[in-house]
């Protein structure tokens, strides 16, 4: 007696494919395949901190948000890494200039700098502040905010 093998192998392959697909649907997709998963998790984790920090004002808020920005820059996917580097570098430069001068960012007034502040220290602070407010920094910050909305489906801050 000869058995027909015409449908045997294709039927087994079809059944295995259906079983595999059903298992995938039950378990769900694996986040390890998503290159943005850890970055988006970090965005969600830091939203409240960034929002609270930024409510303190332009430069001061960015200074307070710097630790969160640094973590997000470390988690950032390749396509937004350059923008994060600009943001972190510019905020860090202002922080460093203020720290080097021993100046409290919250109370610093460039029109009335503290006594004892040298011309070089004032210039370093002014230069860092101008670079932080520059068009390329604003574009980088806008880019990371847009990335959070588009890819992570959440704003960068509350």
Regions found by a protein language model. Give the residues of each.
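Short, intrinsically disordered, charge-biased short linear motifs at domain edges
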Residues: 19-30, 133-142
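Alpha-helical segments in soluble extracytoplasmic regions
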Residues: 46-106
């Amino acid at each position: 007696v000869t058995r027909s093998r015409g449908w045997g192998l294709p039927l087994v392959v079809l059944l295995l494919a259906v079983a595999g697909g059903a298992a995938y649907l039950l378990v769900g997709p694996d986040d390890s395949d998503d290159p943005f998963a850890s970055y988006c998790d970090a965005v969600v984790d830091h939203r409240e901190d960034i929002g609270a920090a930024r409510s303190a004002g332009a430069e001061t808020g960015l200074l307070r948000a710097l630790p969160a920005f640094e973590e997000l820059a470390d988690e950032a996917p390749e396509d937004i890494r350059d923008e994060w580097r600009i943001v972190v570098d510019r905020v860090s430069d202002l922080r460093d200039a203020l720290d080097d001068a021993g100046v409290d960012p919250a109370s610093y007034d460039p029109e009335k700098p503290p006594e004892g502040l040298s011309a070089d220290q004032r210039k370093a602070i002014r230069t860092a502040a101008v670079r932080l407010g520059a068009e390329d920094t604003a574009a980088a910050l806008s880019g990371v905010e847009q990335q959070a909305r588009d890819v992570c489906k959440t704003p960068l801050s509350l």
